[in-house]
Amino acid sequence: MTTLDDKLLGEKLQYYYSTSEDEDSDHEDKDRGRGAPAISSTPAEAELAGEGISINTGPKGVINDWRRFKQLETEQREEQCREMERLIKKLSMSCRSHLDEEEEQQKQKDLQEKISGKMTLKEFGTKDKNLDDEEFLQQYRKQRMEEMRQQFHKGPQFKQVFEIPSGEGFLDMIDKEQKSTLIMVHIYEDGVPGTEAMNGCMICLATEYPAVKFCRVRSSVIGASSRFTRNALPALLIYKAGELIGNFVRVTDQLGEDFFAVDLEAFLQEFGLLPEKEVLVLTSVRNSATCHSEDSDLEID
């Protein structure tokens, strides 16, 4: 049983503050703080939080960030490579088509220069060895024949000898014909030496020179004198654009009484009074193209 003094003393002891006890308590708290490791509040804080961003800056988070970075870098590099391949393929196709077009244009230009006579066959073959000579010659013949055909059909075609019935017909034939037409008039009379030969030559030349108009007229029809008939026949008059450009009287003095078409043709060609003969030109082009060798530098006109 406690006394009043014990109670009083005991109550004082309960409320008594001791500095030694506080110091012991502080030491225990410090010891507990040193021994207990720091524990993360939540496990999620150590993981990556969305889009590869790590909240934790520890070793594990750094490694994950590095792996994610390398993955993105690899994907970007692969995409760049694919884009580069697509670009290279596109450029190569466009460049190839452009080069093919330029090559074809150059071939056509070289061919045109050759046809125009500016380049020999040897130069052409050296410049473009891939083009076959036979192919070139075929193209050349085709174009030359087309040019000759156009020239051949450009003017009127006659192909025969026309008989002039009167003096008025003689004047109309000279004045009313096209200015580009060459007209050859044989003035004749039956029984005059060389008349038959001249008539035969005119018929032959009319077929070989269809663009030239060959005519004949009796000297009596145009009112020629008997003296002219005796001394000047057979006569050959040549007109163009209404003008007399050739006048040959008594042709037998140059060709004799018996002559042929080739003789009369050569005689007229000496004076430049016959145009280029289309049939012979086409034949010469064919023969020259067939016999032309690869190493020859002969130009075909």
Curated annotation (Swiss-Prot):
Q: What happens when the gene is disrupted?
A: Conditional deletion in photoreceptor cells leads to 50-fold decrease in Gbeta-Ggamma dimer formation and more than 10-fold decrease in light sensitivity. A 20-fold reduction in Gbeta5 and RGS9-1 expression is also observed, causing a 15-fold delay in the shutoff of light responses.
| Region described as Disordered: spans on this chain | 17-60
Q: Where is this region: Thioredoxin fold?
A: 158-301
Domain of life from the UniProt record: Eukaryota
Kinase as a keyword of this entry, yes or no, is no
Q: Does the keyword S-adenosyl-L-methionine apply?
A: no
- What residues does the Phosducin domain cover? 36-299
PTM-bearing positions, type Phosphoserine: 20, 25, 226, 293, 296
Q: One GO CC annotation, please?
A: cilium
Q: Name one GO biological process term.
A: heterotrimeric G-protein complex assembly
Give residue numbers for the modification (N-acetylthreonine).
2
Q: What does this protein do, in the record's words?
A: Functions as a co-chaperone for CCT in the assembly of heterotrimeric G protein complexes, facilitates the assembly of both Gbeta-Ggamma and RGS-Gbeta5 heterodimers. Also acts as a positive regulator of hedgehog signaling and regulates ciliary function.
Q: How does it assemble?
A: Forms a complex with the beta and gamma subunits of the GTP-binding protein, transducin. Interacts with the CCT chaperonin complex.
The family line of this record is: Belongs to the phosducin family.
Q: What is the official name of this protein in its record?
A: Phosducin-like protein
- Lineage of producing organism: Eukaryota, Metazoa, Chordata, Craniata, Vertebrata
